Curated annotation (Swiss-Prot):
The gene is lptD. Disruption phenotype: Non-essential under typical in vitro growth conditions. Loss of lptD causes impaired in vitro growth. Decreases LPS levels and susceptibility to polymyxin B, increases outer membrane permeability and hypersensitivity to hydrophobic antibiotics. Causes an accumulation of lipid IV(A). Deletion impairs cell envelope integrity more than the loss of LPS biosynthesis, presumably due to the accumulation of toxic intermediates. Together with LptE, is involved in the assembly of lipopolysaccharide (LPS) at the surface of the outer membrane. This is LPS-assembly protein LptD. Belongs to the LptD family. It is found in: Cell outer membrane. It comes from Acinetobacter baumannii (strain ATCC 19606 / DSM 30007 / JCM 6841 / CCUG 19606 / CIP 70.34 / NBRC 109757 / NCIMB 12457 / NCTC 12156 / 81). It holds the Pfam family LptD_N. Disulfide bonds: none annotated. Residues 1-33 form the signal peptide.
Amino acid sequence: MVNETMKHQFKFNPLATAIFTLLCSGSIQSSYAESAGVVSNIDNNQLKASIKEAYPGQEFFQQYYVDKSAPEAQLRNNKYLSSAFCQGTWITPINPETKALDADKATSVVTADYGHYNPAGDSVLEGNVVIDQEGRTVRADKVTIDKTQTFAHAQGRVQLAQGGLLSQSDEIDYNLKTQTGNLDNSFYISEQQHAHGHAGKIERTSPNVMVLNDATYTTCPPGQKPGWKIQANKIELNQETGRGVTRGTKLYVKDVPVLAVPYFNFPIDDRRTTGILNPQFGFSNDGGIELSVPVYLNLAPNYDATITPRYLADRGAMLQGEFRYLTDGFGAGQIWGGILPSDKEYDDKDRKDFHFLHNWDINDQWSTNLEYNYASDKDYFSDLDSSPISKTDLNLRRAWELNYQHGIPGLKAQLKVEDFQTLDPEVKDVNKPYARLPQFLLNYVTGNPLGLQYEFNNDTAYFKKSINDDSAQESSGTRIYNQFATRYNYRTPAAFVIPELSVRSIQTFYDKDSIASQGLDGGSENKSVVVPQFTLDTGLNFEREGKYLQTLTPRAFYAYAPYKNQDGYPNFDSTTASISYDQLFNPYRFYGHDRLEDNNFLSLGVSYSLFDTVGLERLRASVGQSYYFEDRRVTLKQQDEIDTERNTGPVVSLSSQLNQNFTIAANSAWMSNGDNAQRDFQLYYTGDKGNLYNLGYFYRKDIPGRQDTYDQVVASFIQPIKDNWRIMGHVQYDMDNDVARELLLGVNYESCCWGISVYGRSYYNDLDDPKSPDVSEKRAIMAEITLKGLGGLNNKLASLLENRVLGFNKINQSWTQR
């Protein structure tokens, strides 16, 4: 019998070896604690006696739930701390970053007040038993190992600690050979998940399977009535599969049951495993109440799928799916789509979509991608796609691309085949986009260190658009565009001079269908034009240092290209460039390669910047104007009027960073007759406490042959109002049609362990005309609940704001981490 505290170091696997060595190995060195020679008189009944607690486990939980300002919390260096809305956080005895060694490799230190053999030959340790094993710690009042070293029994507030995890049980029975056993009346803490709970009994049925009976789980602060908790008759955790299964599960909010689920399958680690994902609930005015239950299928390490049965009360049953794959050396991709048979809100028509995307980086120089999209109708995405960033394109892209770059210095090339599905059946064939069957693009730039540079561009494509509705004569064929340019870049800190001489050419060959449609005679089916061009870009740089750094850059740009008649040339993909300050110094007034511009103009401009001592550009102002010496006779359409203006009006660009949080910008362009061609104003403010304000106004005058009218106001805000509450809104107002194309207003509450958002949204499909009597706005009211630690039941609001509110991600981060 030993009646003093003993301490030994040895290999610990299994627990029986530790106790047997402690009691029997005389060769192991011992050290004595300060209490050496004092016989333990601990009363186990007193140790088991519970202090009267307001809720089970109160004493245990409050011991490890500390204020964030506490020294032990500060030692975590802001890692693993709970959310900004929690005053306290869990701190377990062993840092979550500490990795425990395998039991058969770790060295252990065992201390106890008292050790002996009982009459049955069992090994017994009593009084403050501590087993410290390089990343693991066991504490108990008493530990007993049977004489066969097979069964271990620990009792008296048995604590097990390991990297970020801690449990306390009344008793533990464990089979050391099969690594199975039971833990009675256990409380547990997970620091990384900010979670805690209780289990009436924990059974380790195998080395990899643990079953919790009559168990609870919550990420709320410890208390008598947590904000929410999960209670289950049985929770089975399988480390081999990485999945957990609950049976007889109920969700409680403030001790009130609000949801019962007989069976639920969930992940317990980062592995992808088959199971049911979080259901999604919603409501809209044209779909009614809806429910989606995604099922994830982990088919193999390199591919998986998600199948989502979905029910919309006013439309019917729908099935959606997604398949993702990763090949060995041939890239990755995904396939997704959905089908809703006999939509009751859409004349009982079948609604469906299908999408395919594949990307393959063949090597450092070559890559390829393939994309295919299909939808049954133009309203599909606004009606049925639950994603807030769903497509609203009129034309769905289908393309294959082969890309080359980073090989030969200065060379980039692309070969692609591209076609489109036009969703709106009312669109005439003449207004549909051309298919490229195929298109080849090449850009090569080279030069020398002295500033001389050569550039070659080629764009060769066969454009095809069939005209089957007699809306126009067919105009399909091959277009070959070439450009060769030589420029000299002279740049110094004080000035720059960049002359450039280029030659551009277009060759067009109509195909047989177009020749037949237009009744072309021999020779007129082929068109060719060559245009030389000269440009000179020059400017000065002035700087003035003082309290603020000021820069002044006057700039002059001249461009000349002779007129070549291009009437009757097809326009495959070109549009008119928008007006801006930078566009004043660009000789190309068309986007695309269907026209070779005639030029003879001079643009003058000046830019001024003011920088403060921390580098903020407190003011940037630019003003410029173009002066034309000849009419611009080349137009996109033969019926377009020739531009005879002698000059543009002033083009102004202003911006200011008033401080690190507040930015304003304004742009405006006038025509020579004084009419305002376009203007926009934008204001951005992001506060340090989660507040945000955006305001924008955008106007475009209707100029035939150049630009369509556009007149809209966009505004958004996020504003904390009190404690954990904030309100948010977004509006896009179409002033041309005097209607709000989208309106969103919501309120959000965040607590330590749960959050709720309620918002209403009304919107029009981007492809619809609000003035049409057959078009009505879509309306939806959504309630979104997030149980932190379980994931959200819905995440649409965050996605909506992320895609519509500039700066949302940054401000949302400051809100949650404040």
